[in-house]
Regions:
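Long, low-complexity, compositionally biased intrinsically disordered regions
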Residues: 1-660
Length: 660
């Protein structure tokens, strides 16, 4: 029974705490135990004081107290348990039941409220979080940071913010103290303050969009050329372009590695990532590794210059991103695994959905052959986090020792594996929130319109990886010319897409396993979603069927299963012309602009002719300008002409893929 001086519904914050929110604030075991005790009739006696402080007195004499304006972790209890205890949870549940008494005994429903945490002023923030915490957060504010602000919707009725290295949710309207974040406890309050300030900036912008990207704080941006680390990296990229990957020695590779370290030390995270990947490609070529790709090297060289040119554009350099952040106890849902490499060395990337953050994270592992050639299936039994790679790629991971980088990569703190557990994934895919679970691919890709080119977007791992709910799996066939499996599918909204998976010798059984899973009642598929030629294409990672999750890259088999032939597709002349031109410029970068070969010149000339025939006159002119530079200009003129042509081609190719 509740005794109150202000009425039984005076604490709207307690009524707004759903079982899921209580679980996040405490843990599932405490919520279950408190619920069970209340169901058994051992409810505490509640008293609401004039200032709306709620006291709960239990039969064993224990008293729990929850003042207004504070979260559960700031409540008090006379029991010996540290932190949030079952008595505080029982106080909330009992209060909700009393508030619902007189109808059917259910808690009073709380309507969805369109509110903004940005309405909380700094005085209230200091009261809730502490002046010292606010001072620490203010230093991050002065450096500046980016955030993605989400306002309440019918599907997700709580405001939330995606910060560079964590997510903050506000489940209780008007109450900052109940904010939830996946950041570790040591930085929790600081992240809450940053999220509130992000909402404040979004509110001042006055946009009606339910999701909007904002840049918060920061001093005026310096001139783009006032960054010596970036200038040094661009100069080394030019040197590599002149010399060519085929002639790059260990001295240049070492200089690039040091340049990448300097960029990272200067918090230029996105160009640092590009230089690190470029250094990895040079090492792959030196080792004659199969994952060396000339087109990727050319794109990375271009990216370094593109980010330098766009240095004044918010988000182009990643200077406002934190290096990494420890996360509190998190539950992640595995979405499968991608294996790349050779028989001598393989890299496995396990993808995890983070439901609380609405993002996909990547955990990467590397293995080298130990007397036996490696492939995806043999990798499946290798140990990762005290379990097999196969179990990890099809499981749910609960951990208190995870760190998340700005690029959404995961690391597990060494020596704390005991705080990490893995259980089968079950039906967790079907319970993922949007935007992780996609039911309408058209709506997903529509949100991509107007975003910056990939060359200057944030370097986020698994940017386009999603789980797609399927309503239909149509024809499945193998294209021997392209060495890829194709399947026509429809999502839950009826939008069609083409599922395409290329054969890779390191995973010989992947296509057979994929075809079998698609033909066995597939209901969901995880994969990288992108647009190509106006259509939607999915590169699959794993498939959910009534029998469970199939990860093709880890499947057994030698690829000898006979697959039905895929239907023929009409080639797209625009895409083909752009692809060939990009490949021709990549070949020039591979051999070096200081020593262009006759075959390279001929290939570029033919590519320019093809571009002209398809109406891409500007692209053709830039290619011919590069050819002219090879004949008469100094090496600096050659690199400038190559860069102008390459930039135009890469952006044109991206725009062509997005056309509807």
């Amino acid at each position: 029974m509740t005794e109150t001086t202000t009425g039984p519904v005076s604490r709207a914050d307690l009524l707004a705490l759903t079982p899921d929110t209580l679980t996040a604030l405490a843990n599932r075991g405490l919520v279950k135990r408190a619920t069970k005790e209340l169901d058994a009739g051992t409810a505490p006696s509640l008293t609401t004081e004039p200032d709306t402080t709620v006291r709960a007195r239990f039969d064993d004499g224990i008293t729990a107290v929850l003042p207004p304006g504070v979260g559960l972790d700031n409540g008090s209890c006379s029991c010996a348990a540290p932190g949030v205890c079952r008595h505080l949870v029982a106080l909330v549940l009992a209060y909700q039941r009393d508030a619902g008494a007189g109808t059917d005994g259910a808690p009073v429903p709380v309507p969805v409220t369109d509110w903004s945490p940005g309405s909380t002023d700094d005085r209230a923030l200091a009261d809730a979080l502490g002046a010292r915490t606010l001072a620490v957060a203010r230093r991050t504010f002065e450096r500046g940071y980016g955030a993605l602000v989400h306002r309440p919707t019918a599907e997700r009725p709580e405001p939330w913010v995606e910060l560079p290295t964590c997510t903050v949710r506000f489940p209780v309207p008007g109450e900052i103290a109940y904010a939830l974040t996946d950041a570790a406890a040591a930085v929790r309050d600081e992240m809450v303050a940053l999220a509130v300030w992000a909402f404040r900036v979004a509110d001042e912008a006055g946009t009606e969009d339910r999701s909007t990207t904002v840049q918060v704080g920061g001093r005026p941006t310096a001139r783009p050329t006032a960054r010596p680390e970036l200038d040094a990296a661009a100069a080394l990229a030019d040197e590599l372009l002149r010399e060519g990957v085929a002639h790059a020695g260990p001295v240049l590779r070492g200089a690039l590695a040091r340049a990448g370290d300097a960029l990272a030390a200067g918090s230029l995270h996105w160009p640092a990532g590009a230089v690190a990947e470029l250094t990895g490609q040079l090492a792959a070529y030196a080792d004659r590794a199969a994952h060396y790709r000339p087109e990727l090297v050319a794109a990375l060289l271009t990216e370094v210059h593109a980010r330098r040119r766009a240095a004044a554009v918010p988000g182009a350099l990643g200077t406002r991103e934190a290096g990494d952040t420890p996360l509190r106890r998190v539950r992640l849902t595995a979405l499968g695994c991608r294996v790349r490499g050779t028989a001598e060395a393989l890299v496995a990337e396990v993808y995890f959905a983070h439901p609380g953050a609405g993002s996909v994270l990547v955990l990467r592992g590397e293995w080298t052959a130990d007397g036996q050639e490696l492939n995806g299936h043999r990798l499946a039994t290798r140990r990762v986090l005290s379990t097999s790679l196969s179990a990890l790629a099809t499981g749910s991971l609960v951990s208190e020792s995870v760190r998340r980088t700005a690029s959404r990569a995961l690391t597990i703190t060494r020596g704390r594996l005991g705080t990490t557990s893995i259980t089968p994934v079950g039906a967790a895919w079907t319970q993922l929130p949007e935007p992780l679970l996609v039911r309408d691919l058209s709506a997903l890709t529509a949100r991509w319109r107007g975003r910056p080119p990939r060359l200057i977007r944030p370097r986020v791992e698994a940017e386009s990886v999603r789980v797609v709910a399927l309503s239909e799996v149509g024809s499945i066939g193998y294209d021997p010319a392209e060495q890829c499996l194709e399947a026509h599918v429809r999502d839950a909204a009826g939008t069609s897409a083409v599922l395409t998976s290329a054969y890779r010798p390191e995973c010989p059984g992947a296509l057979d396993a994929l075809a079998d899973a698609l033909g066995s009642g597939a209901t969901h598929i995880s994969g990288s979603v992108h647009r190509s030629g106006g259509g939607i294409v999915i590169d699959p990672i794993a498939v959910l069927t009534p029998a469970g999750v199939t990860v093709p890259d880890l499947a057994a088999g030698d690829g000898s299963t006979a697959l039905a032939a895929a239907g023929s597709r009409s080639p797209d002349p625009l895409t083909a012309a752009l692809d060939e031109a990009i490949s021709a410029l990549a070949a020039a970068a591979h051999s070096g602009l200081s020593r262009p070969t006759a075959p390279t010149r001929s290939r570029i000339d033919k590519a320019a002719t093809a571009l002209s025939r398809t109406g891409l006159a500007r692209a053709a002119a830039l290619l011919r300008a590069f050819l002219n530079a090879l004949d008469g200009q100094a090496e600096s003129g050659r690199t400038a002409a190559w860069l102008e042509a390459q930039l135009h081609l890469l952006v044109s190719s991206e725009l062509r893929a997005a056309e509807s």
